[in-house]
């Protein structure tokens, strides 16, 4: 991993478990997939990959809020944090 700020999300020595393309059914009964969910001892991170040129997180806020809500119901006693990871390695927490 060339981006040090991302290493803890992809190096298994740093997290408890990780899941790619994790499916869940939202409140409307739609099947959705979270790009990567990473479980640490004290928190869970929902990561979504973006390949566009813009680093503006605004267009993705509703999507990430939905992911956070869905995962907060699963990990009720754990902090759920969300971030976008752009193709250039930039991490934008939402």
How would you describe each model-predicted region?
Residues 1-94:
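Structural signature of nuclease core domains in nucleic-acid processing machines
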């Amino acid at each position: 991993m060339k981006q040090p700020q991302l290493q803890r999300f992809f190096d298994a020595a740093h997290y408890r478990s990780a899941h790619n393309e994790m499916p869940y059914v939202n409140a409307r009964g739609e099947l959705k997939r979270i790009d990567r969910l990473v479980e640490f001892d004290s928190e869970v991170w929902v990561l979504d990959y973006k390949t566009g040129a813009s680093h503006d997180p605004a267009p993705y806020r509703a999507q990430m809020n939905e992911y956070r809500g869905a995962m907060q119901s699963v990990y009720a006693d754990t902090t759920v944090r969300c971030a976008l990871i752009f193709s250039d390695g930039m991490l934008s927490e939402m």
